[in-house]
């Protein structure tokens, strides 16, 4: 594996290998050392979970880590990201974890610079978030063994969600039994990679084994899509009542950050079925597996 850009570029065997390797790291705490590998984290969008878990993963693997401070870098002088990477590569940095608001940027960088560096996509616009898909699936397979028997529901702004895009793809690759995308009509995607779409919350959650709740982007909700916040809250929020339509042992997940009282109630987020902090924990090990796969190849 030269780069880690999209789930669609991986085989099901590669994905399964990453899942098993992540769980191995989690349960054995036996980590290889890659002290000769240098990695830079370039986050052009704000991040807490992804940025810190990538850095922890890198340090667990004994990599040399460079965190680029964009506010004090030449980016403030108008330097193109392509030139920034070329400059850092000339200093000996081989691996680049990049988050950016532009769809497809990491793939473009890999196409231009791929002979000399390794690009890891930490999220590009509304397009893809592949490491989130890996960690989410690690969390699911840790508790639910037979993916082909599962019904998984994703709830929220599917149309603008890079998390939903990557998760659809990984479900398709691994043969998940059923995937339901629950969203108000204005947030439904024009094209679905895998699964079916509904605007009926209770029907979509009926019998679900896993429920993934997406963050409501309140700034987009109010300004761009003209969807009333109270309407969303009343019809699509994950509450104790709506969760009751899922199976009693259904897993509740959320990629974070959460808007408590908007897309998810605190009673659900902090309840016995919540696996949200387990996702955060697994994010470190999933990203360790991704990095190791790149280095080993």
Swiss-Prot record:
<feature type="binding site">
    <location>
        <position position="77"/>
    </location>
    <ligand>
        <name>L-aspartate</name>
    </ligand>
</feature>
<dbReference type="GO" id="GO:0004070">
    <property type="term" value="F:aspartate carbamoyltransferase activity"/>
</dbReference>
<comment type="function">
    <text>Catalyzes the condensation of carbamoyl phosphate and aspartate to form carbamoyl aspartate and inorganic phosphate, the committed step in the de novo pyrimidine nucleotide biosynthesis pathway.</text>
</comment>
<comment type="similarity">
    <text>Belongs to the aspartate/ornithine carbamoyltransferase superfamily. ATCase family.</text>
</comment>
<feature type="binding site">
    <location>
        <position position="257"/>
    </location>
    <ligand>
        <name>carbamoyl phosphate</name>
    </ligand>
</feature>
<dbReference type="GO" id="GO:0006207">
    <property type="term" value="P:'de novo' pyrimidine nucleobase biosynthetic process"/>
</dbReference>
<feature type="binding site">
    <location>
        <position position="162"/>
    </location>
    <ligand>
        <name>L-aspartate</name>
    </ligand>
</feature>
<dbReference type="InterPro" id="IPR002082">
    <property type="entry name" value="Asp_carbamoyltransf"/>
</dbReference>
<dbReference type="GO" id="GO:0005829">
    <property type="term" value="C:cytosol"/>
</dbReference>
<comment type="pathway">
    <text>Pyrimidine metabolism; UMP biosynthesis via de novo pathway; (S)-dihydroorotate from bicarbonate: step 2/3.</text>
</comment>
<dbReference type="Pfam" id="PF02729">
    <property type="entry name" value="OTCace_N"/>
</dbReference>
<dbReference type="Pfam" id="PF00185">
    <property type="entry name" value="OTCace"/>
</dbReference>
<comment type="subunit">
    <text>Heterododecamer (2C3:3R2) of six catalytic PyrB chains organized as two trimers (C3), and six regulatory PyrI chains organized as three dimers (R2).</text>
</comment>
<dbReference type="GO" id="GO:0006520">
    <property type="term" value="P:amino acid metabolic process"/>
</dbReference>
<feature type="binding site">
    <location>
        <position position="256"/>
    </location>
    <ligand>
        <name>carbamoyl phosphate</name>
    </ligand>
</feature>
<feature type="binding site">
    <location>
        <position position="129"/>
    </location>
    <ligand>
        <name>carbamoyl phosphate</name>
    </ligand>
</feature>
<feature type="binding site">
    <location>
        <position position="49"/>
    </location>
    <ligand>
        <name>carbamoyl phosphate</name>
    </ligand>
</feature>
<dbReference type="GO" id="GO:0016597">
    <property type="term" value="F:amino acid binding"/>
</dbReference>
<dbReference type="InterPro" id="IPR036901">
    <property type="entry name" value="Asp/Orn_carbamoylTrfase_sf"/>
</dbReference>
<dbReference type="InterPro" id="IPR006132">
    <property type="entry name" value="Asp/Orn_carbamoyltranf_P-bd"/>
</dbReference>
<feature type="binding site">
    <location>
        <position position="215"/>
    </location>
    <ligand>
        <name>L-aspartate</name>
    </ligand>
</feature>
<dbReference type="InterPro" id="IPR006130">
    <property type="entry name" value="Asp/Orn_carbamoylTrfase"/>
</dbReference>
<dbReference type="GO" id="GO:0044205">
    <property type="term" value="P:'de novo' UMP biosynthetic process"/>
</dbReference>
<feature type="binding site">
    <location>
        <position position="50"/>
    </location>
    <ligand>
        <name>carbamoyl phosphate</name>
    </ligand>
</feature>
<dbReference type="InterPro" id="IPR006131">
    <property type="entry name" value="Asp_carbamoyltransf_Asp/Orn-bd"/>
</dbReference>
<feature type="binding site">
    <location>
        <position position="99"/>
    </location>
    <ligand>
        <name>carbamoyl phosphate</name>
    </ligand>
</feature>
<feature type="binding site">
    <location>
        <position position="132"/>
    </location>
    <ligand>
        <name>carbamoyl phosphate</name>
    </ligand>
</feature>
<protein>
    <recommendedName>
        <fullName>Aspartate carbamoyltransferase catalytic subunit</fullName>
        <ecNumber>2.1.3.2</ecNumber>
    </recommendedName>
</protein>
<keyword id="KW-0665">Pyrimidine biosynthesis</keyword>
<keyword id="KW-0808">Transferase</keyword>
